[in-house]
Amino acid sequence: MEVFNLMTNQNKPYGKIASGKRNSKKRYVTYRKTNKRKAQIPPEVKESVRIAFLGGINEIGKNMTLYEYGNDMFLVDCGLAFPDADLPGVDLVIPDFSYVERNADKIKGIIITHGHEDHIGGLAYLLKKVNIPIYATKLTIGLIKGKLEEHRLLNSAKLVEIKPRDNITLGSFNIEMIHVNHSIPDAVGLAIRCPAGVIIQTGDFKIDTTPVDGDMIDLSRFAEYGRKGVLALLSDSTNAERPGYTPSEKSVGDSFENLFRKANKKRIVVATFASNIHRVQQIIDVAYARKRKVAVVGRSLENLVKVGSELGYLNVPQGLLIDINTIKNYADDQLVIITTGSQGEPMSALTKIAFGAHTKVTLSPNDYVIISATPIPGNEKMVGNVVNELMRHGVEVIYEKMYDVHVSGHACQEELKLMIGLVKPKYFIPVHGEQKHLQKHAKLGEAMGIDKKNIYIANIGEKIELCDDKIKLVENVPSGEVYVDGIGVGDVGNIVLNDRKHLSMDGIIIVVATIDSSTGQVVSGPDIVSRGFVYVRENEALMNSARDLACRVIDENYNVKFHDWNAVKSGLRDELSHLMYERTKRRPMILPILMEI
């Protein structure tokens, strides 16, 4: 593993990098790896810059964008998405890297805007295809290291640490990192400069005037670029439907203080997003003030606390954290348990606790559970099931509909309008959202005075060109979804998924028979095995009918001379499927297994 720090003169990074801070008296320092030639003057005739959307458009998750100028390319983010219910057995969904692989020699690196899964979760899979330098802030690098270590890629990775207001040069591009507020520290937006002009990509952001860490979004840099002229703005659309402003993260801390006071003699359990360091910090602060010890449950949360503490993003008083195995040594009013599972995930710690499946935490009526999150669309039923189960155990449960225990990390309408007003782009491209979010954000752009013809709602896979007078669709590049199932990547396609759906709906019937090749007679079987279709002992008449039918089909279709197995198997599938539907109105999968002796 090669890790570079921009403020030292050791381990010089892969591109030209200038480092600077707000209100810093340090000089900007420039490093070059080996190339000592003078910078070439851009030609008078400019090319147009092109953008390819490989993920994060018309969907939530697997964000990935490619920028191209001349023969130079670079990537922004490489995330994952979690599978919908119609993808049985699939663990993760990542972008299609075909276009990236095809242009591997042109790609100068990848910049990661922040450490959420939908922005870093696909990195390990990308690096197995193309090993390019990764540029990210300190915390994001820390989280990426954990991902790469799991895939045994850490030693070969090229990681370059960057900070807000640093500038990096990747071929024809010079990119400045701009600090933004989000639900994880160290998030940045990008000012992307090339001979064609300046493009601002906000990344995930909100405008928090009272951030927990005291570091407000760098609006002055966005405004400065707006004064100089911006060719295009790519802006976060997640909350484009929500009017007003997103509340400050600090307001959740105030809610925690009130709720912890009310809990008094009870044991407090707080479920939140594992990546929300500011939320975890506020829980720790209130627990410390109430003289309670804190235990952490859930692998991802444990990792976040470890990385956040080591890198200085979490301030944990000495002796406050205790091992989950020791919680029985403390009275209920001396404990706070922070856990994963705010989305009701089936294998999460909170779900296991609720259903009595957790080996270390057992519920009691004296527990006080706070779910500090809003259900992601599609997760409402799972969260509801967990809440109901907790309440069946006599546990008092507090969630967002009852109390202000969560705020979003994304900008609402007034913040989005402010960003547009500061940047004043010629072209506006809403990103990071479903179609409804992109459309609503586009309307906000129109309301802020951007010409409708200069607003472009992209589709995944489109490569566009920012021309002098319009945005032009150049081509559609390979894109879409690649499914990760266990250690398999991309080996689960529509055929496999259709089989899984078929099995999940009507089950399977397996027909096993042994045939004498010289006579064509069935010498063993047919045996009928049913899984997920009917309970055999209660349907013996149906199974006997299936056996008789299988014998007849084999006799009629098996040809001693030609041994046409396909005809026999096709006949078995057709006839048995007809029988099963006639008797049960179900269509199980029919799988014939024929052996010849």
What are these regions (language model features)?
Residues R242-S372, I376-P425, I429-F562, K569, ...:
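Hard-cation-handling environments
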Residues L148, G445, M580:
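Conserved hydrophobic residues forming the short capping helix/wall of the S-adenosyl-L-methionine
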